UniProtKB/Swiss-Prot annotation:
Pfam families per UniProt: EGF_CA, hEGF, TB
Name of the protein in its database record: Latent-transforming growth factor beta-binding protein 4
Function per UniProt: Key regulator of transforming growth factor beta (TGFB1, TGFB2 and TGFB3) that controls TGF-beta activation by maintaining it in a latent state during storage in extracellular space. Associates specifically via disulfide bonds with the Latency-associated peptide (LAP), which is the regulatory chain of TGF-beta, and regulates integrin-dependent activation of TGF-beta.
Stored PROSITE patterns: ASX_HYDROXYL, EGF_1, EGF_2, EGF_3, EGF_CA, TB
Chief site of localization: secreted
GO biological process, alphabetically ordered: elastic fiber assembly; hormone secretion; protein folding; regulation of cell growth; regulation of transforming growth factor beta receptor signaling pathway; transforming growth factor beta receptor signaling pathway
Length: 1624
């Protein structure tokens, strides 16, 4: 018995068990009552039938009530308060002394708890602080709502539940679960154990284990009894406190002593292992790494799993899974090294005879972008946020490197856009690091240039290398997350040095009990997890044909195909289950289990597994299948400084004492500044804040506790103002002082003013004497006081005229002096005044000057050309410039004038602009001189330079022509006539009429039609003839006139090489046509044919093989040389041993298993035929195919073919007029005689020694490969179909592949709608499509409309709403898409389910409008449009039966656009559109699908079509395609979309989270305004790769344009200007 007053601690474990098979558990074993007690061996407990109150941590039990323990602030350590004013003394760690004690501490006998019990046990009471205590809940930051925002309830609560929070339903009694979808039975009294149960033992670590407090091993075992058909998942085991948690301190001491005595016992780990579906195999090589050894046990395991070498070279002391192994002596520290001279382990060096650890971090250069942390024998890299360890664990790389986002990779940038994508979507890292792609993604993101910082960020390993997520999965795993799996179906053999290990998950072993009794009560059908020992399902009643596993080993997908006598079955891998049809392994969606895993986090399903995404305040549990609350109160240092920390789910609370409040960051308590919160707290005083309180400091003149009382200083004695008047003021007083007195401010008395101390002082020139209230001035001789008596002023003695007789009197301060007047002055009234010489008598400066009087003299200002005498004032005289300057020289003479001068220039010269020089006259520019010659100016004259045949005239001012014929006489030209010409002459002959003399002396024909114009012949056409002309009828182009006056066609094809080597010229009336050979197309000039690059025009024609263009055709080259490309299946297969390459031929099975090719459809019943010796008659007739079809008469391959050409190729019958003679079988002697060389060869002229390959593509034209591309081979042919089609070997055409009919689900969780060449997926609300557009996922985070209203389920013929939904209100979208036909009190009608509005509102697809199929075929140019017929009823096949499982990229998706115009039958949609995807609809504008035939399914409710399906329209000229994309969404109201401005420059689309704006190209989304704003491409362009080369970038609305710089001109390359070439 424990002693009174002492307390101890023993562990109590709480296990939360969530049975996956709830009904079976409740049926087989009774649920325990809420008062059930967990029995711990060795601990006293009450009987199970007695109700027991268990108090929460921090509370004590008193009289069947739980009382909260209260401790003073700072009186107890954190979590050490045991009761009122009582602290819990710390207890040292208690190691286990013996196996019996160890078992008593960790072993539990347990029964499952009900959901109510689990909630009651985990619920914690949240205390509220009394009085002034502040209470803060720490939450993740959220956007503050504007005004009063109602609570959005996106959950649809079932069974009468009410949505009270965005993530919570308030469920009625007997129901539970997030959506109230689970039926939970009420509390039942305990019942005796039912025989036939199975006991499972789970061994796992404690979730909240702390070594410093608990002092026991962190591994515990839990025993659970459950039915054999139930599977139990233990999410976590926690330690909780209870009223019986008191022990004797002496018992603790004894246990501690016993533990020390047993220290030599072997170390063991309390864990048992058994196979389980989601665990690790023993071959994984990972185990627990233990940091401490306590009492014979390994304790304190590190989070996660490690290999033994990594553990022992680091901080571990022991390692193991089932048994604990001490680290090797050579892997420990320096004390463990025994051999003094032996080599040290890696990471150690010998110092003074011992091995010491090497600090690798001190050398530098390690852990790029991270922090290096030294460990024993090595080092580790700690990466900052946003970075991860790479596979070498020696550097940190950006998280963007392993982004799994995939998109198209473009190889060509052309005309400002992206083109030529590769065939599959890949990650940006693979695209750009391989340097194959130039841009990536739907927005055409340019790959960074090689060597740039952006390139090094996404390609840290350099060009040609990339990181995959699997390389970093071990390094980037969060603590507690599930490690990588090792499939149980593929066991591996451990090396000799490794040890078996188990995953960091609870393992269990099964203990069989007697068989349970059958329970007749039915239960819900829930999926059971697959068991590794399970051998396979039962053989289905009807399955595919036998031999499927040999023909198609991967028919089961993620599983193993097992042949059965009547078919096959599948053994599925872990995480997959057999499909309902029993023919495929499909993924098990663990997230849909009941109850779902990952609570309270979010579960994300993945193929074969799942993962948990935990919210803030939670962390992944040890099993990575749950989210555990983070106890922030256990942090070091603990939060809530100056207060008490209380943990809450996902956060924590700070309870602060009075005068304190929680800090803004919520991690501590801070003092409340009362002075700041209440500014007027102290009135006129100063508030001083104190820890937990405050006080007021009053200024002078105030008093009181809040400084509210004023002090009256005027009532004091003696009066404070002296001779002045005192006026009391608030907080002080004011003195009104008389003249001569002043106060120094409020509260200062009146004092005498010393005027003599002023600056400047009064009484200038005198002495100042201060008096009481005034002053006086004492002045010296010569001064007297002024009238105010404040200054001494000078006495002016010069006012007496007799002071200086005959002289001038000059007064000075205090005196005066007499002086005689200077020159230029005279005495006037006792003063000397100036004499004005300019106004007295004649002008002193003469007629050419201006007189200016000065003091005592004057000054003369002379006109130009005149100057005054120097040294004295006088009249202005003329200046002779000709004597003083070198004017008019050397071509003139200077002449002086009065006030100036003039130049007399020589002939040929004239005065300059200023008249001071003589300049040459340029006669050549002023007169028309030297006609027919060149005028050259000379100094003072000019001269004429005459051309040959000219001479100067008599006046030497012109050039005259020399008449050679007159001067040199008739002998100059002999017998011809001499004709003079300007500058020369010519000898001409006398020509006949209609001819004229040519330049070489010959007679040339005169073209009258050109010389006289078309008027010469009127309405006819003028045709020149030698010496004359004639008028002929006018013929059109391509025709020529006949001798009879008519027009006839010109045969351009007479020249056989007119159309080139790859075409045949066909003459047409008035024209011609070049018919190109296969693989060629007409050039722009129409005169020749050029090669067609099928690798660019036929996207995806080679599948995964490499497409190589050749002249007139193309090749599909397989990456592995032994393989060859099979065009019928689109795959590379081993080479066939047989010589035939005809479609449908069966090659021999290859040695290694490969992906099987598409087998031909099952043979249809053929018409009976009788043996025959040969056809009746010979010659050329019709060749038929598919003769067993009902319309066999229409199945004509070709006409005018021989019996051999038909039957030795692909024909099945030969004849005429539907009188068909069947071709002989290939194994018959008749066939061997007809076709001695086999199919595809003929014996020319009956010579069996020769053979000729038959070109089926040329012989049968487009009938042998309808809607495809036919390529001839030797022998046979290949038919290449576009993506989404396969070649039908009987119908000889490419037909649409119905992906929806394939065994592999095309749309997981949704409805599949097949389209021509592709398919689309649609989901029923509230499910939405994920990023792959092929899978429907839960939309838990979708934000619905705020406006709730009544939903009307029926609308009558008179538009009257009726039958409202009474259980709940709904939004407009919810009502129209799920429940009713009208919404709101105004009875707003919902859109019709076959309308565009309904499609856009509810995110569903509807059947297209039907129209006749457009006949297709590949002519010149190629067209898209396969003929649609009845669907094939056989086994469905797609382009690839199953995609390769290990490829790091996704197959190229089908064209997602609704109106994507297909200009070629293969490849992706056009990339000159703004976006790859748009949500307008599922069909293209080139053709519409045919009406559904037999077997075609439309998963829609039938209603009358109120509106036809809209046909797309071409955007108007000058408009953008983005505008047409937004048209289907323009009718969405702002209230529906939740966006106020309606997504300007974008369109409103529905996304899993609700609605958002999808911006057009050139715009980005501004999240603050939810509007699309223009992207300034010019500002965001990188300097290393400018947008405009040799040009200036100018931003425009939604785009940009380039303006070439001066000296540059635009080129054909977009946004690129080249130096302009100078014009010739």
């Amino acid at each position: 018995m424990p002693r009174p007053g002492t307390s101890g601690r023993r562990p109590l474990l709480l296990v939360l068990l969530l049975p996956l098979f709830a009904a079976a558990t409740s049926a087989a074993s009774p649920s325990p009552s809420p008062s059930q007690v967990v029995e711990v061996p060795g601990v006293p407990s009450r009987p199970a039938s007695v109700a027991v109150c268990r108090c929460c941590p921090g509370q004590t039990s008193r009289r069947s009530r739980c009382i909260r323990a209260f401790c003073r602030v700072r009186s107890c350590q954190p979590k050490k308060c045991a009761g009122p004013q009582r602290c819990l003394n710390p207890v040292p760690a208690v190691p286990s002394p013996s196996p019996s004690v160890r078992k008593r501490q960790v072993s539990l006998n347990w029964q499952p708890l009900t959901l109510q019990e689990a909630r009651a046990l985990l619920k914690r009471r949240r205390p509220r602080g009394p009085g002034g205590r502040g209470l803060l809940r720490r939450r993740p930051p959220q956007r503050a709502p504007a005004g009063k925002a109602p609570v959005l309830c996106p959950l649809i609560c079932h069974n009468g539940g009410v949505c009270v929070k965005p993530d919570r339903c308030l469920c009625p009694p007997d129901f539970a679960g997030k959506f109230c979808q689970l039926h939970s039975s009420g509390a039942r009294p305990p019942a005796p154990a039912v025989p036939g149960l199975t006991r499972s033992v789970y061994t796992m670590p404690l979730a909240n284990h702390r070594d410093d407090e608990h002092g026991v091993a962190s591994m515990v075992s839990v025993h659970v009894e459950h039915p054999q058909e139930a599977s139990v998942v233990v999410h976590q085991v926690e330690r909780v406190s209870g009223p019986w948690e008191e022990a004797d301190a002496e018992a603790v001491a004894r246990a501690e002593a016993a533990a020390r005595a047993e220290a030599a016992a072997p170390y063991t780990v309390l864990a048992q292992s058994a196979p389980r579906e989601d665990g690790y195999s023993d071959a994984s090589g990972f185990g627990y790494c233990f940091r401490e050894l306590r009492g014979g046990e390994c304790a304190s395991p590190l989070p996660g799993l490690r290999t033994q070498e990594v553990c022992c070279r680091g901080a571990g002391l022991a390692w193991g899974v089932h048994d604990c192994q001490l680290c090797s002596e050579r892997l420990g520290n320096s004390e463990r090294v025994s051999a003094p001279d032996g080599p040290c382990p890696t990471g150690f060096e010998r110092v003074n005879g011992s091995c010491e650890d090497v600090d690798e971090c001190a050398t530098g250069g390690r852990c790029q972008h991270g922090e290096c942390a030294n460990t024993r024998g090595g080092y580790t890299c700690v990466c900052p946020d946003g970075f991860l360890l790479d596979s070498s664990r020696s550097s940190c790389i950006s998280q963007h490197v392993i982004s799994e986002a995939k998109g198209p990779c473009f190889r060509v940038l052309r005309d400002g856009g992206c083109s030529l994508p590769i065939l599959r979507n890949i990650t940006k890292q693979i695209c750009c690091c391989s340097r194959v792609g130039k841009a990536w993604g739907r927005g055409c993101q340019l790959c960074p240039p090689f060597g740039s910082e952006g390139f090094r960020e996404i390609c840290p390993a350099g060009p040609g290398y990339h990181y995959s997520a699997s390389d970093l999965r071990y390094n980037t795993r969060p603590l507690g997350q599930e490690p990588p799996r090792v499939s149980l179906s593929q066991p591996r053999t451990l090396p000799a040095t490794s040890r078996p290990s188990a995953g960091f998950l609870p393992t269990h072993r099964l203990e069989p009990r007697p068989e349970p009794r059958p329970d007749p009560r039915p239960g819900p059908e829930l999926p059971l997890p697959s068991i590794p020992a399970w051998t396979g399902p039962e053989i289905p009643e009807s399955g595919p044909s036998s031999g499927m596993c040999q023909r198609n080993p991967q028919v089961c997908g993620p599983g193993r195909c097992i042949s059965r006598p009547s078919g096959y079955t599948c053994a599925c891998d872990s995480g997959f289950r057999l499909s309902p049809q029993g023919t495929r392994c499909i993924d098990v969606d663990e997230c849909r289990r009941v109850p779902p895993p990952c609570a309270p986090g979010r579960c994300e399903n993945s193929p074969g597994s799942f993962r948990c995404v935990c919210g803030p305040g939670f962390r992944a549990g040890p099993r990575a299948a749950e989210c555990l609350d983070v106890d922030e109160c256990h942090r070091v240092p603990p939060p809530c400084d100056l207060g008490r920390c209380e943990n809450t789910p996902g956060s924590f609370l700070c309870v602060c004492p009075a005068g304190y409040q929680a800090a803004p960051h919520g991690a501590s308590c801070q003092d409340v500044d009362e002075c700041t919160q209440s500014p007027g707290l102290c009135g006129r005083g100063a508030c001083k804040n104190l820890p937990g309180s405050f006080r007021c400091v009053c200024p002078a003149g105030f008093r009181g506790s809040a400084c509210e009382e004023d002090v009256d200083e005027c009532a004091q004695e003696p009066p404070p103002c002296g001779p002045g008047r005192c006026d009391n003021t608030a907080g002080s007083f004011h003195c009104a002082c008389p003249a001569g007195f002043r106060s120094r401010g409020p509260g200062a008395p009146c004092q005498d003013v010393d005027e003599c101390a002023r600056s400047p002082p009064p009484c200038t020139y005198g002495r100042c004497e201060n008096t009481e209230g005034s002053f006086q001035c004492v002045c010296p001789m010569g001064f007297q006081p002024n009238t105010a008596g404040s200054e001494c002023e000078d006495v002016d003695e010069c006012e007496n005229h007799l002071a200086c007789p005959g002289q001038e009197c000059v007064n000075s301060p205090g005196s005066f002096q007499c002086r005689t007047c200077p020159s230029g002055h005279h005495l006037h009234r006792g003063r000397c005044t100036d004499v004005d010489e300019c106004s007295s008598g004649a002008p002193p400066c003469g007629p050419h000057g201006h007189c200016t009087n000065t003091e005592g003299s004057f000054r003369c200002s002379c006109a130009p050309g005149y100057r005054a005498p120097s040294g004295r004032p006088g009249p202005c005289a003329d200046v002779n410039e000709c004597l003083e300057g070198d004017f008019c020289f050397p071509h003139g003479e200077c002449l002086n004038t009065d006030g100036s001068f003039a130049c007399t220039c020589a002939p040929g010269y004239r005065p300059g602009p200023r008249g001071a020089s003589c300049l040459d006259v340029d006669e050549c520019s002023e007169e028309d001189l030297c006609q027919s010659g060149i005028c050259t100016n000379t100094d003072g004259s000019f001269e004429c330079i005459c051309p040959p045949g000219h001479r100067a005239g008599p006046d030497l001012a012109s050039c005259l022509d020399v008449d050679e014929c007159r001067e040199r006489g008739p002998a100059l030209c002999g017998s011809q006539r001499c004709e003079n010409s300007p500058g020369s002459y010519r000898c001409v002959r006398d020509c006949d009429p209609g001819y004229h003399a040519g330049p070489e002396g010959t007679c040339d024909d005169v073209d009258e039609c050109q010389e006289y114009g078309p008027e010469i012949c009127g309405a006819q056409r003028c045709e020149n003839t030698p010496g004359s002309y004639r008028c002929t009828p006018a013929c059109d182009p391509g025709y020529q006139p006949t001798p009879g006056g008519g027009c006839q066609d010109v045969d351009e094809c007479r020249n056989r090489s007119f159309c080139g080597a790859h075409a045949v010229c066909q003459n047409l009336p008035g024209s011609f046509q070049c018919l190109c050979d296969q693989g060629y197309e007409g050039a722009r000039d129409g005169r020749h044919c050029v090669d067609v690059n099928e690798c660019e025009t036929l996207q995806g024609v080679c599948g995964a093989a490499l497409c190589e263009n050749v002249e007139g055709s193309f090749l599909c080259v397989c990456p592995n040389s032994p393989e060859e490309f099979d065009p019928m299946t689109g795959r590379c297969v081993p080479p066939r041993t047989s010589a035939g390459t005809f479609p449908g031929s069966q090659p021999q099975a290859p040695a290694s298993p490969v992906l099987p090719a598409r087998p031909p459809p099952p043979p249809l019943p053929r018409r009976p035929s009788t043996p025959r010796q040969g056809p009746v008659g010979s010659g050329r007739r019709e060749c038929y195919f598919d003769t067993a079809a009902p319309d066999a008469c229409d199945n004509i391959l070709a006409r005018n073919v021989t019996w051999q050409e038909c039957c030795c190729t692909v024909g099945e019958g030969w004849g005429s007029g539907c009188r068909i003679q069947q071709c002989p079988g290939t194994e018959t002697a008749e066939y061997q005689s007809l076709c001695p060389h086999g199919r595809g060869y003929l014996a020319p002229s009956g010579d069996l020694s020769l053979r000729r390959d038959v070109d089926e593509c040329q012989l049968f034209r487009d009938q042998v490969c309808k809607s495809g591309v036919c390529v001839n081979t030797a022998p046979g042919y290949s038919c290449y179909c576009s993506n989404g089609y396969y070649y039908h070997t009987q119908r000889l055409e490419c037909i649409d592949n119905d992906e929806c009919a394939d065994e592999e689900p095309a749309c997981e969780g949704g409805r599949c709608v097949n389209t021509v060449g592709s398919y689309h997926c649609t989901c029923e609300p509230p499910l939405v499509l994920d990023g792959s557009q092929r899978r429907c996922v839960s939309n838990e985070s979708q934000s619905l409309d705020d406006n709730l209203g009544v939903c009307w389920q029926e609308v009558g013929a008179d538009l009257v709403c009726s039958h409202p939904r009474l259980d709940r209100q709904a939004t407009y979208t919810e009502c129209c898409c799920l429940y009713g036909e009208a919404w709101g009190m105004d009875c707003a009608l919902c859109p019709a389910q076959d309308s565009d509005d309904f499609e856009a509102l509810c995110n569903v697809l509807r059947p297209p409008a039907y129209s006749p199929p457009r006949p297709g075929g590949f002519g010149l140019p190629y067209e898209y449009g396969p003929d649609l017929g009845p669907p094939y009823q056989g086994l469905p096949y797609g382009p690839e039966l199953y995609p390769p499982p290990a490829l790091p990229y996704d197959p190229y998706p089908p064209p997602p656009g609704p109106f994507a115009r297909r200009e070629a039958p293969y490849g992706a949609p056009r990339f000159d559109m703004p976006d790859f995807e748009d949500d307008g609809g599922p069909y293209g504008e080139s053709e519409a699908p045919a009406p559904p035939g037999p077997g075609t399914r439309w998963p829609y409710r039938s209603r009358d079509t109120r509106r036809s399906f809209p046909e797309p329209e071409e955007p108007p000229e000058g408009g953008s395609y983005a505008g047409s994309l937004a048209e289907p969404y323009e009718e969405l109201e702002a209230e529906e979309c939740g966006i106020l401005d309606g997504c300007t420059n974008g369109r409103c689309v529905r996304v899993p989270e609700g609605f958002t704006c999808r911006c057009f190209d050139g715009y980005r989304l501004d999240m603050t305004r939810m509007a699309c704003v223009d992207i300034n491409e010019c500002d965001e362009a990188e300097a290393a790769s400018p947008l405009c080369v040799n040009a200036r970038c100018l931003n425009t609305d939604g785009s940009f344009r380039c303006i070439c710089r001066p000296g540059f001109a635009p080129t054909h390359q977009p946004h690129h200007c080249a130096p302009a070439r100078p014009r010739a």
